[in-house]
């Protein structure tokens, strides 16, 4: 629900043209078994695919497809990325600075800076319920809250079910083309590190 409000705020021009996005998602797992899904290369483990996908998807939604990127990572004992950072650069010169970690808890927030203000998506930005919009144009700070029940995946399931009932195979909110572009970028980032899973 909050993502709808974010899209409205961005399209309204409240913060002007988006120039920078900072977003992170890091946590320290309670258990760190090498055989578990988080750290096991046989199960496509690592921070990028487990939690880094959320900041990356947010960047895609806000800024589109990047023209270039630079990235670095910390290889863990199982060979997967336990921590990673990525800078995405876009045709208009804007940038997204993204971070993921399975080594420590980060702020888990997103901060969108525009030419006329900014938007802070508060903690747990991958399932956001609160954002603060600060606009130099209106000289006001506005807090938008959209609480929800559950972990947020229920909204994805409901939306997908609605598409199926309508006989649709694509949609305007998250197109197949955008999904494939994000998957391709994830592969390119891992390629830049030299990280390949055993089944690839």
PLM segments and residue spans:
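Predominantly a Rossmann-like dinucleotide-binding segment in NAD(P)-dependent oxidoreductases
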Residues: 1-69
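Solvent-exposed strand-loop boundary residues in beta-sheet-rich modules
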Residues: 92, 137-139
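C-terminal helix-rich "cap/oligomerization" subdomain common to oxidoreductases
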Residues: 91, 162-200
């Amino acid at each position: 629900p909050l993502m709808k409000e974010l899209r409205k705020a961005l399209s309204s021009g409240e913060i002007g043209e988006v120039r920078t996005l900072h977003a992170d998602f890091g946590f320290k797992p309670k258990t760190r078994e090498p055989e578990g899904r988080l750290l096991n290369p046989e199960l496509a483990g690592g921070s990028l695919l487990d939690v880094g996908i959320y900041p990356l998807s947010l960047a895609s939604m806000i800024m589109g497809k990047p023209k270039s990127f630079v990235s670095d990572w910390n290889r863990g004992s199982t060979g997967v990325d336990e921590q990673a950072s990525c800078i995405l650069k876009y045709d208009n010169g804007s940038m997204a600075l993204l971070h993921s970690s399975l080594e420590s808890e980060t702020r888990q927030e997103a901060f969108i800076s525009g030419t006329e203000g900014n938007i802070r998506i508060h903690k747990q930005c991958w399932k956001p319920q609160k954002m603060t919009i600060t606009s130099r144009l209106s000289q006001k700070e506005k807090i938008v809250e959209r609480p929800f029940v559950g972990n947020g995946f229920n909204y994805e399931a409901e939306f997908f079910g609605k598409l199926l009932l309508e006989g649709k195979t694509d949609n305007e909110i998250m197109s197949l083309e955008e999904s494939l572009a994000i998957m391709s970028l994830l592969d390119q980032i891992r390629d830049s590190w030299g990280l390949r899973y055993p089944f690839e």
